[in-house]
Amino acid sequence: MARAASKAARTTEKGLVIERRFTTAGVHPYDELEWEKRDAIIGDPAKPAFEQRGVEFPKTWSQNATNIVAQKYFRGQLGSPERETSVKQMVSRVADRITEVGREAGYFASHEDADAFDAELTSILVNQKAAFNSPVWFNVGWKEPGQEQASACFILSVEDDMDSILSWNTKEGIIFKGGSGSGINLSKIRGSMEPLSKGGIASGPVSFMRGADSWAGAIKSGGGTRRAAKMVVLDVDHPDIEKFIWCKADEEKKAAALKAADFDMRLDSDAFTSVQFQNANNSVRVTDEFMEAVANDEDWDLVARTDGRPIKTVKARDLMNQIADAAWQCADPGIQYDTTINRWHTDPNTGPITASNPCSEYMSIDDSACNLASLNLMKFRNEDGSFNVDDFTHAVDIVFLAQEILVGFSSYPTEQITRNARAFRQLGLGYANLGALLMAEGMPYDSVEGRALAGSITALMTGRGYRMSARIAATTGPYDGYAVNREAHNQVMRMHQSAAYEIEDELVEEPLLHAARESWDEAVALGEQHGYRNAQATVLAPTGTISFLMDCDTTGIEPDFSLVKFKELVGGGQMKIVNGSVNLALETLGYSTSEIEQIDAYINEHNTIIGAPALKDEHLPVFDVAVGERSISHTGHIDMMAAAQPFLSGAISKTVNLPETATVSDIADAYMDGWKKGLKALAIYRDGSKTAQALKTDAGDKKSEPAAEDPKPKRNKMPRERESITHKFSVGMHEGYITAGKYPDGSVGEIFLTDIGKEGSTIKGLMNAFATAISMGLQYGVPLEDYVKKFSYMRFEPEGITRNPEIPFAKSLPDYIMRWLASRFIDDVDYLESLGIMTDEVRARKEAQQAFPMDDTAGDGGNGHSNGEGNGTANGSAEPEAEAKPATAALTDTPPVVPAKMGADLELGPACDQCGGMMQRTG
């Protein structure tokens, strides 16, 4: 098999000979497909967010892929003649442009070979066997030559001076505009405890992160089709590492407060964009030395950037616990394992790897770039369940060559990145749909067989990629940086080769494992002879949008998120369906057609496979998914990453999902586990830890109880039509209106404050926010009495006399508002009297008390010292009647009765019934 596949691209002195496998000379790939015209509509058909009618797609492409491709990747202004209307236009625009440049650059042995390459690449793309990263679809063949940015990933650098810091922001803006993302390590910037050369103290990297985050948030990546993407890295020995660890978690508390106040906290909402540090992923760079210090509970120095002196010493384990605690709260920061990363570095003599792209899969030298592409693994599964090695290796050859050609004519945001991209020519070939493939094969994601299959496929992909790289180098020469890094690069190749022979033979089908090992044997041998055209070959990217383009069930290396999904229908609307890989798995496991139909119907009804008729208990692990009742453990995620990592040039973009009940210790253990198992990076997500959560599972998944939390409160929204009462008030020289909306039972559920201050003034904004917060609290069940207790007699300007005889004097606007609400919605006369609210009932009571003095033994008499328990004393002890003082002694200007509980809560004396001021207690 492997020998036949190796014919895909032979090398001659003139260039590469391209064999056809997916196409036939003289027959265009488009002619082998059935096509149809559809409408691409996103959102409500009556008022769609996007609409393009009459677009042409292959019949095999789903409506979901149609909508996403038309909206994201078709170029040209909607409604204009230039607007693309067919997948044929989009695919040919890219494939033809790459082939054109390949011809001109001498990659092909003949025109026929160039034609074969064009046809094979077109076939691979239009049949959803592979896809390039988004910038290729955005720019290639559409932008003018010299402006065709094809890379999705960039790594930048920054020095410890203002010019460099400001330049960093400019570079990022250019990258985001082109539809790409970037990462940077800020560890060269001195900490906030370090002095400046001309006096004063440095701002520190976290302060500069604020500005960069806002800048990123203001730029829609790719002309408004994607959010800007950033990665910020800080070394674990930086003086500001603790500030860095907590910066996002602290902002997440703000997001939670906004959500509690009923602000829209979706990822693109105005409220969410006000929360800082949300446009970047944060990662801490840790070394083996630090991780060993954590394991041994040793001290760890945070050192100055200027002279290397220790500024602060902490416990390494405490620092790791802080990282885990912050990640528990908000999923950041992640971890990057610096020593491991640089151990597998092919170009260490040029410089170390200090950072990554936003998703942590591309790791290379500073000021460098990588263009990505991904293969759809399910397209290489034969009907009998075997893996089609020949098709896969051929696709690797074609797509890898296309990526290599892209490097040469792609544009780059800076001169330094341009030089490094063309000198090192880093590529990022990867795959998607691994989770679906494993399920279809009847293999649990968390199993030794599943990990062995994933490792073998990854080994084959990277070995074949470097084999192709060496073939290209035989014609064009190796990459410019190869000579100075030759021994290091070749040593890393041997490390990959050795890892391929560590996969257990009995766990993988022989043709696949044989091809994987043979590809590495050939890659190492050819590299020793010719060198390599590319410093890096593969990564495992998240394949977000392009996985939908390829109609993948799962992204990157991820398992299935849920067994049920919603399919967009061609005529509009949605239909709930069971993932196709479920039925394939059941077939592989030997279930009959009728049994599969029963199980399928059960999943559709219950949104889970647990309890399905005819399903054997031993097969349940095959259907474990990322979240839900039978979710894959975090160790299962980490073990899968560890199976693939030895065969990748870069790293793996993957989220390790943990349930909401996971603890801080679980996260710290996961970070340690990732280090021990040889990962390059690890990101954790505890379910529910983000205020704006991007992806939800199906409604049928049972929610586990929150860790150490009470059930979440429910909001009792106001009816559409409700009664209200509006009250005009004045406090000092300030006037305004309070409107209180009522539930059908007459209780208050919302307040509005109007005409308080000028439009746009601080006081108006604050009072509007105050009213919103109070309204939300009332609707979530906070008792009005609690608000009244908290805000009554709160003192600040404006304060003064009012025109309300019930509340003659107010210490502040919240004081007046709360006491007025109490006067209208609280019937407890004692309570109102204790607040100095002189309602008619309170005045009548006072007059009655003065006219008919009560006996001291009545329990809560008018001596001003009652504790509310009926004993007539302040301390709760009963005084003998013989010693009781006559009640008439206390009747002159008797202050309002203050129940002991209320007095203790307010810690104030009763109010004067003339001016409303709180009197000082004298006994």
Predicted regions: what they are:
Residues 756, 760-840:
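Phosphate-backbone binding interfaces of nucleic-acid-interacting proteins
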